[in-house]
Amino acid sequence: PIITKNSTNINIRKVHNDRFDSKKAALVGLKPDLKVSLMPSDLALNCRNLCREYYDLMDNRSAYVNKLQGELRIAFPQYLGIFSKVTINTSLTLLETYTSPSAFLKADKQEIIDIIKSTARFGLTYAQNKYNAIIQAATDANQFGYIIDSNIKRIRLYISFIRKYDEEINSILESLHELVDANEDSDFVKQIHLIETFKGAGFL
């Protein structure tokens, strides 16, 4: 497509008509230094669209992670320091199952340890240490935290959103890898692999 200049720079008029505008566009096309748009290939367009959607989903996910942390700071503040990230699978599974400090304190010890072992896969010692930390955090939260039913509802709601975003983000990453793998011989993919060789540059 032709890149045309703003019509207000050519003539000032109150009434616009097709005859004048078409003539102006034709005159622009006669210029020897005419610039035209460079249309990317379908492969580049697909990669660009998926990358944009990936980062958009990541931004939305981060917003719900912040909301989850905000709720926990009020209802269960000591829980935030137990795991490396509050959004790892073990942490989210525990919060989905019990959510409130009182629920953790009432829960069966072995049940919590089994959940930690099955999701973290670091062994019994790790699971027991995390259990002790959670119980201590729950005990402290009963004294310093403040939780009502709406906090529990929102914590579980935010976790469900985070899990859904994780699912869609992983789906987009899989699609990107499939797209690249299917076009290994193209110059575009070769350029991607070249960029990946730079220190600090990843797949995206």
Question: Which ranges hold each PLM region?
Answer:
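A detector of single, family-specific signature residues
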Residues: P1-L204
